Design a protein with these regions (language model features):
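General "foldedness" signal
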Residues: 45-48, 59, 78, 82, ...
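Charge-enriched amphipathic alpha-helical scaffolds
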Residues: 62-104
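Homeobox/homeodomain signature
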Residues: 21-24, 54, 81, 85
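C-terminal engagement modules used by replication, chromatin/transcription, nuclear envelope/ESCRT
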Residues: 5-10, 89-117
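Positively charged, polyanion-binding regions of nucleic-acid-associated proteins
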Residues: 26-75
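Intrinsically disordered, low-complexity serine/threonine- and proline-rich regulatory segments
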Residues: 2-42
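Intrinsically disordered, low-complexity N-terminal regions enriched in serine/proline/glycine
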Residues: 20, 30-33, 51, 86, ...
Length: 117
């Protein structure tokens, strides 16, 4: 059986702040509001990605999001993180923006807004 060292999943699990979304906001605008209110989510996803990519070639941001939800449910007394699945594609792009060297390791697909243009 493999054990996980405690430092491997040490994350900043500050409680989420639910921003106020105005009627008619686009998905991108809602993501930007969520990210502005919760920058620690991107930092935690970045930490998880770095840990994974130190041992593997590819990582799925959906898996990182699920891991973050799980860790927040295990490591805190509050509710597990509730992150809109639609935001994960934006987080993938944000991680690549922060770490261009990860571009070949994180799969992205065109966004609906890109296909509509």
């Amino acid at each position: 059986m493999t054990t996980i060292a405690p430092e491997q999943l040490t994350l900043n699990l500050t409680p989420l702040v639910e921003p106020i979304y105005e009627t008619g906001m686009t998905l991108e605008e809602r993501f930007e509001a969520f990210h502005a209110a919760n920058p620690h989510v991107a930092d935690a996803l970045e930490s998880l990605a770095a840990q994974w990519l130190s041992r593997h070639r590819k990582v799925g941001v959906k898996s990182l999001g699920e891991t973050l939800r799980w860790a927040s449910g295990i490591q805190t007394d509050g509710d597990p993180y509730r992150i809109n699945n639609s935001y994960l594609s934006r987080y993938a792009r944000l991680l690549i923006e922060r770490h261009p060297e990860w571009a070949d390791s994180i799969e992205t697909r065109s966004l609906a807004t890109e296909r509509a243009a």
